[in-house]
Amino acid sequence: MVLQNDIDLLHPPPELEKRKHKLKRLVQSPNSFFMDVKCQGCFNITTVFSHSQTVVVCGNCQTVLCQPTGGKARLQEGCSFRKK
C-alpha cells in the first residue's frame, strides 16, 4: 500500500528541509550567514551579518544599509546583496 504522503527520508525535498529546525535537518546547517551589501549611493561594499542586531551604516556616506528586526536584518530599499 502506497500513500500519497510518503516521502523519501534519505532524499527529502529542499523546500521541506529549509523549513525544519536547524538541528533537525538531515545535514545540520545554520540559518545565518554573512553577506556583502552594496550601498545604493556610493556603491561601497560592506560585509554584514544576516541576523545583525544593530543598525549597519555605510563607511563612506553614512547611509543606513540594514535595520534589525526580531530575526533577520531588513535591508533598505535599493541595496543589493550576495551571500558569502
Swiss-Prot record:
<dbReference type="GO" id="GO:0022626">
    <property type="term" value="C:cytosolic ribosome"/>
</dbReference>
<protein>
    <recommendedName>
        <fullName>Small ribosomal subunit protein eS27w</fullName>
    </recommendedName>
</protein>
<dbReference type="GO" id="GO:0008270">
    <property type="term" value="F:zinc ion binding"/>
</dbReference>
<dbReference type="GO" id="GO:0006412">
    <property type="term" value="P:translation"/>
</dbReference>
<keyword id="KW-0479">Metal-binding</keyword>
<dbReference type="InterPro" id="IPR023407">
    <property type="entry name" value="Ribosomal_eS27_Zn-bd_dom_sf"/>
</dbReference>
<keyword id="KW-0862">Zinc</keyword>
<dbReference type="GO" id="GO:0003735">
    <property type="term" value="F:structural constituent of ribosome"/>
</dbReference>
<dbReference type="GO" id="GO:0003729">
    <property type="term" value="F:mRNA binding"/>
</dbReference>
<dbReference type="InterPro" id="IPR000592">
    <property type="entry name" value="Ribosomal_eS27"/>
</dbReference>
<feature type="zinc finger region" description="C4-type">
    <location>
        <begin position="39"/>
        <end position="61"/>
    </location>
</feature>
<keyword id="KW-0687">Ribonucleoprotein</keyword>
<keyword id="KW-0863">Zinc-finger</keyword>
<comment type="similarity">
    <text>Belongs to the eukaryotic ribosomal protein eS27 family.</text>
</comment>
<keyword id="KW-0689">Ribosomal protein</keyword>
<dbReference type="InterPro" id="IPR011332">
    <property type="entry name" value="Ribosomal_zn-bd"/>
</dbReference>
<dbReference type="GO" id="GO:0022627">
    <property type="term" value="C:cytosolic small ribosomal subunit"/>
</dbReference>
<dbReference type="Pfam" id="PF01667">
    <property type="entry name" value="Ribosomal_S27e"/>
</dbReference>
<dbReference type="GO" id="GO:0009536">
    <property type="term" value="C:plastid"/>
</dbReference>
